[in-house]
Amino acid sequence: MANQTNNKAKALLDWTDARFPLSKMWNEHLAQYYAPKNFNFWYYFGSLALLVLVIQIVSGIFLTMNYKPDGNLNAYHLPAAFTAVEYIMRDVSGGWIIRYMHSTGASFFFIVVYLHMFRGLIYGSYKKPRELVWIFGSLIFLALMAEAFMGYLLPWGQMSFWGAQVIINLFSAIPVIGPDLSTWIHGDFNVSDVTLNRFFALHVIAVPLVLLGLVVAHIIALHEVGSNNPDGVEIKKLKDENGVPLDGIPFHPYYTVKDILGVVVFLIVFCSVLFFAPEGGGYFLEAPNFDAANALKTPPHIAPVWYFTPFYAILRAIPSFLGTQVWGVIGMGAAVVLIALLPWLDKGEVKSVRYRGPIFKTALVLFIIAFIGLGILGAMVATDTRTLVARILSVVYFAFFLGMPFYTKLDTNKPVPERVTMSTTKQKIMFFVYVGITVIGAYLFATKLRDRKSVV
């Protein structure tokens, strides 16, 4: 009986392969795709980003079934879009968990993407021959920012409304075409029902299609050149008599099993936040967004969601010059674009931070401090002291990129091994100690800042 079932399954597979390259794709991208055998903790976040993308798509579909993109007032003198969200939360079966899954998923999406990008930064995954992989990844980041910004308007709460108003009005700072461009994006002279409808269309259809296309291109480009590893060694250089890399193992089943472990741990953390702290202490869902949008009432403090705050802090840190704020807009845009230019800014011959010299390591630590510091300052009310600190951190941020062609040439690197090396037990213990201290410190620091923010 079992043999008969297997024969039928094989016959079906053969029939499919004759018409569609199913087995070929399986082998090229999983069973016979050889990945370095020394992947570590940092290599979980690529697969986790795919998982969160699926969560966002599925939860978004169910939200769309019950959401109404209408900014006009209903019979209760509340915007229909705002009441649609409240209807989902209160009257739709399981609506509250779908809504929180989507809002929490947005923040977790940026968490795993930022960690994924950081992995590429420390291990030189942007260097030859992976320039296109990095470019596609940078475009994914841009598309993700656009998707998040447009989706942020849809609840039609106070912070959604005024946050969109502030960001869209930034385009009016562009000389000559700015005012017309701002009006064109609005679809009106202000954020209105027209803006809401076009943002809904872009958020639900246009940007997700672009995002999915870029993800496919990113994976195809990665599998064409092969995965990087913590040593920055190209495993394709050393192969056995069968053409198999000596330091490579099949992605399936080895790394699919590894990724399943990562998925389980991630879902435990994700569900813990989802069920017990979906508002993320006011960072995932801000308190003003529980009030309906009111064009006649400005919130005391307008700030973007936490994952945009580093770039928003740079925008605020750059003073107006020659009577225009366009320099802040340029600075904010440059802060994102420079990330995509890393393959050409880095002139060093070594990829991995393990074998980089002290100059690069120092610059990297300063960059991390600057990025986190800007993120914290961007979420807070601007004061003279905070603006000064933000300007200093902005200089550090841009110096990391603009100075890279020079300090990577001057750095003294360590010799790179010909083959990959495995992490020792001591390195693993020290890593988890470092991560634990960092997480606890970040939590305590963020809690203190949140308390100070509430006082302000």
Where are these regions (language model features)?
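Terminal, Lys/Arg-rich, intrinsically disordered segments and adjacent short helical elements
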Residues: 1-9, 232-245
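A short, charged helix-loop
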Residues: 176-187
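Hydrophobic cores of alpha-helical transmembrane segments in multi-pass integral membrane proteins
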Residues: 45-68, 73, 80, 86-177, ...
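Extended, aromatic/histidine-rich regions of cofactor-dependent oxidoreductases associated
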Residues: 20-28, 194-197, 379-389, 416-420
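Conserved small/polar residues in nucleotide/adenosyl-binding loops
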Residues: 453-456
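Functional cores that coordinate and move charged inorganic groups
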Residues: 186-210, 214, 222, 229-232
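Hydrophobic alpha-helical membrane-insertion signals
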Residues: 1-65
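Cytosolic juxtamembrane amphipathic/interface segments immediately preceding
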Residues: 24-44, 122, 188-195, 240-255, ...
